[in-house]
Amino acid sequence: MWYFRALHRRRAHWLAALLPPGPARVLDAGCGTGGFIRVLRAAQPAWSVTGLDLSPLACGLARERTRAEIAEGSITALPFAEGTFDAVTTGDVLYHVEDTLAALREFQRCVRPGGVVVVNEPAYRWLWSYHDDAVESKHRFTAPGLGSRFRAAGLKVVFSSYANMLPLPLVVARRKLFPPAQPTSDVQLYPAPIEALFAGMAALEHAWTTRGWSLPAGSSVFVAGVRR
């Protein structure tokens, strides 16, 4: 699925860009069934990747599929000591919790001084739609707003950008002009030509942002920071 491939690539790139070479301890907070853990392990064999998820079912599947250490718990109360990790990352999880600042403070607490926090979340309250109802969203963010939360949590923002800018007109049209009869998630596998189109758009955006250039708009927002 193009969306998850792009999301995994974005997070993996910035973790690798901001962490020093060599071994690292990384937490995937809200790891689901372990898809991103597998991506990181393949890309960075020297890293020790731990997962955490609120769902017992997801934790069980993640353990089975990755053989990694998987903890059951909430991102607002991480069951780890201060400074346990070199990096904490989450992808489209923060928007599910009421107290997003509490979660970011937990991420800050659990990384060492100078440690990295990488977050990707849905963008723009005005883009709220049937999709958000289907996936039980509580928030959508802007880049300035999410960056402000990072700073309030004791994190220094080192890169901030929107993502999925090129598909944004199609997303707006789908969600605002042609909504389905029943609430459903837009994150799904599309026919191969559509998947290829979106994957090509994502590749162009990745080439842009990996140069350190931000995108001014998009259906997702991405922030990377370090613990002060």
Predicted region positions:
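Conserved N-terminal segment of class I S-adenosyl-L-methionine
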Residues: M1-A81, A87, G91, L104, ...
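Short conserved AdoMet
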Residues: R63, E98, R112
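Short catalytic micro-motifs in class I SAM-dependent methyltransferases
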Residues: D92-H96
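A short glycine-rich, Lys/Arg-flanked "PGG" loop and its adjoining helix->strand segment in the class I
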Residues: L101-V116
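Short, glycine-/aromatic-enriched active-site segment of Class I SAM-dependent methyltransferases
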Residues: V117-H139, G145-R149
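Conserved S-adenosyl-L-methionine
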Residues: L155-M165
